[in-house]
A protein has these predicted regions:
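Glycine-rich, acidic/polar active-site loops that bind/position phosphate-bearing ligands
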Residues: 121-305, 314-317, 324-559
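Active-site core of metal-dependent hydrolases
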Residues: 7-120
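Hydrophobic/aromatic-rich, well-ordered segments within soluble, folded domains that form packed cores
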Residues: 61, 65-69, 282-298, 324, ...
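C-terminal amphipathic alpha-helical interaction region
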Residues: 491, 496-693
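Hydrophobic alpha-helix feature that most strongly marks membrane-spanning transmembrane helices
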Residues: 69, 87, 297, 327, ...
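Active-site-proximal loop/turn and secondary-structure-junction residues that shape catalytic pockets
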Residues: 44-48, 68-70, 98-99, 146, ...
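Gly-rich Lys/Arg/Thr-decorated short loops/hinges at beta-loop-alpha junctions or inter-strand turns
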Residues: 2-14, 33-35, 151-152, 222-231
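Short linear, low-complexity motifs centered on an aromatic residue
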Residues: 73-88, 108, 206, 213, ...
């Protein structure tokens, strides 16, 4: 591997490349667009486009694409070449400002939730100059937003950018009251990406992994994660080679891949980046997932990003580390060193607490999916109940403020009032892995997102709801006669009114859901239950207020999320039916036949046949149970076709089909433990999880 600083970002049209290749005036104009959102003149765009093209062609590119993030949660691209015909029958390489700034892919084939009809194909991509263009597979990729002819957002990025502007404006109102000279506030994110690596040859023998991304059948391996020997354990040589290759590719794309390690479950790993501006971090995470999968193929692996690929062991999440900072370098969630900074920190902290409490429903809905339903509340991931962990020390400080008493700590003494907190070291907040939303020293870690989720959705919600509360605070403080008294009262009142959502205990305990209900916290356990929250009037109002989503855009997203849920479970159900009929039941029948023959032969020799007879009886009973469950599932899948309402269909899939699938799996997994290995039609959990060398 070459020297990392030499090649880091070498495939990115970043600031250093812009400085080198653009005229000074053009560079300054582009910087104003990037930093302040100023409109970009078409002449400037032409110069930038030509410089981009020259740089890309020098690096071997022949095509460019507007790279965008439709509501599939994946990325999309349409490749166009740079070639332009000349009069003498040759070609030249051209790329105009218009082609840079705007594209027109067919929008009709992407999920729109009713925003576009199939015959209304026109959709537009618009360049996001704040996210650098990059080279991937010999193509110049230009990060873009994607919208309809009427300006409706058809992607994940557009609402995210809108929400970032909302929190910028709201936070600046608050900072102005504290005399800050900041002119911009940015939301930052560092998404920790978990994933599984399994041998590709074994993966290719499992229809469920291929079609559904997770195992729909499978008895537990004799060993799971109970020895706790995989987490942070020695990384196997083949996996290490994969990780090294992955790092190099990510670094070339300017992605700050920082930490890699084994996770809790066997064959599970994690990659964590250094945090970045939310829209850029979102782009980088989408790229990371894409490159993870592509690189895995090179190394003979399959990278599984499903939230729960294997039953009985941990699934994969994506911890979303969220903070807000100013362009003057101040992290607004970092306790300060002066009384004024402490008061400012407390105001932003209480704003987040109130926002999460007021809008816990849409925060939960933002991470809803069929795959993530398997994780949440399964003693491996946070429960589906939103609560906030602050740690004993910070909670003690807030309690003292509410009670108007002095807070004392063995290490620090704090005066309550304006000068509430000293500098608060990161390690004074414990790590409570059972909390869905935890303060970790200078940021909040939202732990509910699933591993394959685009982080655009939850961060759009976070930015918007915090912006709303900051505006409420600003409205009150701006008209106060005595700012200090009003500030103290606001902080104290907000903490008191929102203490119900602060919980530092064990979120996995049986007692917590009961306690949470007493506190008035929501427990939206499934996607069909959670997603409709987007259309509650208070939520429509807050998104509309900031121009993040129109009501029509929210309705489309609810429709898309529920439709995706239904389609996912339908694919899983049909796959289970197929595997049962073509693989599991025939394998069981063959084993029964061979064991029965063995019993006959043994009897003819006068030998005992207890094992053979008992095995045949046990497997036959399980086959009967499985066959009946198969019939029930098939019949219920047929009923789906008569349901027209998407919400009703999603409820049916959750309440009926999902239960049918569980009933079919139970006897199948028991049969697996009884049938000889050479008879079993696909690799077992032991094969998949423990045989990567």
């Amino acid at each position: 591997m070459a020297n990392v600083p030499e090649y880091f970002g070498s495939d990115v049209f970043n600031e250093s490349v812009m400085k080198e290749r653009l005229p000074k005036a053009t560079y300054k104009a582009l910087k104003k667009t990037i930093d302040n959102g100023d409109p970009l003149d078409i002449e400037v765009a032409n110069i930038v486009a030509n410089a981009m093209k020259d740089w890309a062609v020098e690096k071997g590119c022949t095509h460019y694409t507007h790279w965008f993030q439709p509501m599939t949660g994946l990325t999309a691209e349409k490749l166009d070449s740079f070639i332009s015909p000349t009069e003498d029958g040759h070609v030249i390489m051209e790329f105009s400002g218009k082609e840079l700034v705007k594209g027109e892919p067919d929008a009709s084939s992407f999920p729109s939730g009713g925003l576009r009809a199939t015959f209304e194909a026109r959709g537009y991509t618009a360049w996001d100059p704040t996210s650098y263009a990059f080279i991937k597979e010999k193509a110049l990729c230009i990060p873009t937003a994607f919208c309809s002819y009427n300006g409706e957002a058809l992607d994940k990025k557009t609402p995210l950018l809108r929400s970032m502007e909302a929190i910028n404006k709201s936070a600046l109102r608050i900072l102005k009251l504290f005399g800050s000279d900041a002119t911009r506030v940015t939301a930052n994110v560092g998404p920790e990406q978990e994933y599984f690596l399994v041998d590709r040859e074994m993966y290719a023998k499992r229809e469920d992994l291929i079609l559904a991304g997770r195992s729909l059948y499978g008895a537990p391996a004799p060993k799971g994660q109970e020895l706790e020997d995989h987490y942070f354990g020695t990384i196997k040589a083949r996996v290490q080679a994969y990780m090294k290759d992955l790092d190099e590719q990510l670094w070339r794309l300017g992605i700050y891949a920082k930490t890699k390690h084994n996770e809790v479950a066997p064959a599970q790993h994690e990659l964590a980046p250094i945090y970045g501006t939310t829209n850029i971090a979102t782009d980088h995470n989408q790229l990371t997932m894409e490159i993870m999968k592509r690189t895995a193929r090179k190394h003979g692996f399959k990278c599984l990003l499903h939230e729960k690929p294997f039953a009985g062991i941990n699934g994969s999440g994506k911890h979303n580390n969220w903070s807000i900072s100013t362009n003057t370098g101040v992290n607004l969630l970092d306790p300060g060193k002066t009384p004024a900074e402490n008061a400012q920190f407390l105001l932003f902290l209480t704003a987040v607490i109130k926002a999460v409490n007021d809008y816990q429903d849409i925060l939960r809905a933002s991470v809803a999916s069929a795959g993530n339903d398997h994780r949440l509340g399964a003693n491996e991931a946070p429960p589906a109940i939103i609560s906030i962990f602050l740690g004993d020390e910070l909670t003690g400080v807030l309690d003292a403020i509410v009670n108007g008493v002095k807070y004392e700590d063995k290490r620090v003494e704090m005066e309550i009032g304006v000068d509430v907190l000293p500098h608060f070291p990161k390690d004074t907040t414990d790590r409570n892995r059972t909390s869905p939303f935890a303060f970790t020293g200078n940021k909040f870690e939202f732990r509910m997102p699933g591993s394959k989720l685009s982080v655009a959705g939850p961060n759009t919600v976070l930015n918007t709801i915090v912006a709303d509360v900051l505006d409420q605070f600003a409205d009150e403080l701006e008209k106060a006669d005595n700012f200090q008294d009003a500030l103290d009262d606001l902080i104290k009142r907000t903490i008191k009114e929102n203490q119900n959502i602060i919980f530092n205990g064990n979120g996995y305990s049986d007692e917590w859901p009961v306690e949470a209900e007493k506190r008035g916290l929501l427990n939206l356990k499934s996607t069909p239950e959670a997603v409709p929250a987007f259309l509650a009037q208070k939520n429509v109002d807050v998104f509309s207020k900031y121009g993040v989503y129109t009501e029509a855009e929210l309705q489309s997203r609810v429709e898309i999320l529920l439709d995706e849920y239904c389609k996912t479970l339908n694919i899983e159900a049909l796959t289970m039916i197929d595997m049962a009929k073509k693989e599991i039941l025939p394998a069981a029948a063959k084993y029964i036949k061979d064991i029965a023959k063995t019993a006959e032969l043994a009897k003819s020799c006068g030998a005992e046949t207890v094992f053979e007879e008992e095995t045949v009886k046990e497997i036959s009973a399980l086959v009967t149970e499985m066959y009946k469950a198969l019939g029930t599932l098939e019949a219920d899948v047929q009923k789906v076709h008569s349901i027209e309402d998407t919400q009703e269909m999603a409820n049916f899939f959750h309440d009926t089909i999902f239960a049918d699938m569980g009933a079919l799996r139970v006897p199948a997994d028991k049969i697996e433990t009884l049938v000889g290995k050479e008879y079993w039609p696909y690799p077992t959990y032991s094969d998949l999880l423990f045989y990567v060398k």
